[in-house]
């Protein structure tokens, strides 16, 4: 039951984190700025998450994990409330930064807690359950939030997320046990884990995967509008992606436990890279009446492959010793959001220099690079804490 409440909180965080892609045109119109400039809301959030997560983990290292999760979720809710009343783009940017601090503290801790209370043979599924909160958010929260933003204004979407966060907070207050173990790793040990060659390869793989995905996802509404998609159609496309992501997430957890982490991650990356590259092919060469259907099919394949990778990658890191794995998971989340930040920047550059039809192949090349790195490196080594810290 405790893991379920963690998933509910992840649902609130995932809804806010991904719904912004559907709100960019609405916010751009309201703030009277370009969609590319508005896209930096994604970059600011992701960069704050990437840098803030490990720093906050060290700052609150001696705090009970239950209290840490509650503190993080309160910060996330406060950021959404700030967005509701934001009267300018800089204030909205600041609110996204506050949200990211809360999310960056919450998600790695939640995954670590889920692993700590799960049996060894079910750890992959425990990770998948927590991360499924984020992927289910792409199924329900993102398309619904996008529709609400289009009909009632983007502020209404942030208000909805604040309510979701409050509901999750209530569940954690009453459903999460106390006495969860604290992290005992020092700053030196954390840096030692980050410097370990096997972990660095894993983090680079995650960052490349995330960069490729967000290069396309951040500005997905732009090529879709070019094909004649209206607000309802774009919400439908986001729903298709969300359903596929949820399926991929669960498949990633199950296959990791059955056939292994690296084969599962490799299959996910290959599927994702191919689907992204084919999006560009469809946009450039397919007739518009066919491109609409083809794009939806490719978005579905992309969602399955892309989100099968992440639980497999996380489960691979869990094979490390307990203290190391918790640090590695936090670093992996930072690598993912660093990739998200780079994807937001890359997507904006592609739109400005090339065009919407080029987003897919550039994003796909980044994911393909992640696959090449994964296959080159193979299985992670399992270092000892004393060895890498000493």
What do these predicted regions represent?
Residues 105-118, 307-321:
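Intracellular juxtamembrane helix-capping segments at the cytosolic ends
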Residues 53-64, 248-261, 351:
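Helix-to-loop junctions at the C-terminal end of transmembrane segments
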Residues 91, 119-175:
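Helix-loop-helix hairpin linking two adjacent transmembrane segments in secondary transporters
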Residues 89, 95-134:
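Cytoplasmic helix-loop-helix junction between adjacent transmembrane helices
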């Amino acid at each position: 039951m405790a893991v379920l409440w963690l998933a509910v909180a992840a649902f609130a965080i995932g809804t806010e984190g991904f719904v912004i892609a559907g709100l960019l045109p609405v916010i751009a119109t309201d703030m009277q700025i370009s969609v590319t400039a508005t896209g930096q809301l994604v970059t600011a959030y992701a960069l704050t998450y990437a840098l803030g997560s490990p720093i906050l983990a060290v700052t609150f290292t001696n705090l009970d994990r239950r209290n840490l999760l509650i503190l993080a979720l309160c910060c996330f809710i406060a950021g959404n409330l700030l967005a509701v009343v934001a009267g300018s783009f800089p204030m909205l940017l600041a609110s996204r930064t506050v949200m990211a601090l809360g999310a960056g503290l919450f998600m790695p801790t939640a995954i670590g807690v889920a692993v700590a209370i799960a049996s060894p043979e079910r750890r992959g599924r425990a990770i998948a359950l927590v991360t499924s909160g984020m992927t289910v958010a792409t199924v329900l929260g993102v398309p619904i939030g996008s529709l609400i933003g289009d009909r009632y204004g983007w502020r209404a979407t942030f208000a909805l997320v604040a309510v979701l966060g409050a509901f999750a907070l209530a569940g954690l207050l009453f459903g999460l046990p106390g006495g969860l173990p604290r992290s005992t790793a020092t700053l030196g040990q954390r840096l030692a884990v980050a410097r370990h060659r096997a972990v660095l390869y894993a983090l680079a793989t995650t960052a490349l995967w995330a960069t490729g995905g967000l290069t396309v996802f951040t500005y997905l509404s732009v090529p879709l509008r070019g094909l004649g998609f209206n607000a309802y159609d774009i919400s439908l496309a986001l729903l298709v992606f969300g359903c596929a992501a949820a399926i991929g997430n669960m498949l990633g957890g199950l296959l990791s436990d059955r056939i292994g982490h690296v084969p599962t991650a490799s299959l996910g990356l290959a599927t994702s890279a191919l689907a992204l590259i084919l999006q560009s092919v469809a946009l450039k060469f397919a007739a518009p009446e066919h491109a609409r259907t083809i794009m939806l099919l490719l978005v579905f394949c992309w969602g399955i492959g892309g989100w099968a990778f992440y639980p497999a990658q996380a489960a691979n890191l869990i094979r490390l010793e307990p203290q190391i794995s918790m640090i590695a998971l936090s670093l992996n989340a930072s690598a993912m959001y660093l990739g998200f930040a780079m994807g937001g920047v890359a997507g904006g550059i592609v739109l400005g220099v090339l065009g919407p039809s080029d987003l897919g192949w550039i994003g796909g090349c980044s994911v393909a690079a992640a696959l090449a790195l994964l296959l080159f490196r193979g299985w992670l080594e399992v270092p000892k804490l004393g060895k890498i810290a000493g």
